Amino acid sequence: MNKKSIRDVDLKGKRVFCRVDFNVPMKDGKITDETRIRAALPTIQYLVEQGAKVILASHLGRPKGQVVEEMRLTPVAVRLGELLGKDVKKADEAFGPAVQEMVAAMNEGDILVLENVRFYAGEEKNDAELAKEFAALADIFVNDAFGAAHRAHASTAGIADYLPAVAGFLMEKELEVLGKALSNPDRPFTAIIGGAKVKDKIGVIRHLLDKVDNLIIGGGLAYTFVKALGHEIGLSLCEDDKIELAKEFMALAKEKGVNFYMPVDVVITEEFSETATTKIVDIDSIPSNWEGVDIGPKTREIYADVIKNSKLVVWNGPMGVFEMTPFSNGTRAVGQALADAEGTYSVIGGGDSAAAVEKFGMADKMSHISTGGGASLEFMEGKELPGVVCLNDK
């Protein structure tokens, strides 16, 4: 990684504005999944050990520039204190005189959690005045919120105009793992692209066709490719305006010597429910009033075999509607193949794929689970991320 990290700067006695991703799911004021809080702990602990005054900033939910009581970060600050076993103070605002007083009273190793930065309309507009207010609280900016790195916001990018800016450990690991996958991958390198829509994955497919040895397609977006080959797909999801693009991608793969894998059989249903009747049919035999909802057993075997023989696998997007049990076997099978593959480095691209390996209890068998769905997707598209570009070079 060619960006400075917290290892490269002197932190003792410094006020550090650390942007973290504490955007955790909440229900009735309780945190239902604290993965993101735990992911930030190594950076926070390091800052504390180095004698910094640690000021933590995050968003939670989408309050759209106004105060929404149930989106306050108070429960997060409480839980953070429990996890660290130390006192964590919480401000009622994210800047201003009251916050400045709290910062002035901090000792080395103290932690202060600011209020939800998205309570202020200037945050998502990357407003320079708000960025200056944030910067006024600190001596150094640390970005450890990879999940928000694709956003040019006041607390993720704008603040870096006014302070030295470095990466936290979580950000550093994401950039190293994803960066190596794209610039210097171990081979064979396989990308598994699933999810519902082709339009969401156009950029990533196009960018990866130049880099991978194998491209595996699954999920709802597969049916646009199936239709592009001239097969009937019944009521399956399809983007007719993307059929020509699908043809172009398949031709490009051939031209570049990329093995392009598509479902050979699928699970079909007439209704979306937990108790749905399903059938397995070959890809060219989907009846007109049925819909494809998962990859079939023959496809699972082929995909598992490709995975097993790969050195690096990047997975972005499920193989079917994994939230419903009858349609979850394809996604589970891909997860299982990754869990069982020896000598294969697996990178799970955040979002639904991360939720799936979590749901199936396979998370600890994956080499790297990205903490950013949208951010990892944009990184995989070869885009520059504002929250990364703004960091100081080594």
UniProtKB/Swiss-Prot annotation:
The modification Phosphothreonine is found at residue 299. Gene3D superfamilies: Phosphoglycerate kinase, N-terminal domain. The keyword Iron-sulfur does not apply. Keywords: ATP-binding, Cytoplasm, Glycolysis, Kinase, Nucleotide-binding, Phosphoprotein, Transferase. HAMAP family: Phosphoglyc_kinase. GO terms for molecular function: ADP binding; ATP binding; phosphoglycerate kinase activity. Substrate binds at residues 21-23, 36, 59-62, 118, 151. This is Phosphoglycerate kinase. Pathway: Carbohydrate degradation; glycolysis; pyruvate from D-glyceraldehyde 3-phosphate: step 2/5. GO terms for cellular component: cytosol. It is found in: Cytoplasm. The modification Phosphoserine is found at residue 183. It comes from the Bacteria. It catalyses: (2R)-3-phosphoglycerate + ATP = (2R)-3-phospho-glyceroyl phosphate + ADP. InterPro entries: Phosphoglycerate_kinase, Phosphoglycerate_kinase_CS, Phosphoglycerate_kinase_N, Phosphoglycerate_kinase_sf. Its EC number is 2.7.2.3. Belongs to the phosphoglycerate kinase family. Monomer. One of its GO terms (biological process) is gluconeogenesis. Its main location: cytoplasm. ATP binds at residues 201, 292, 323, 350-353.
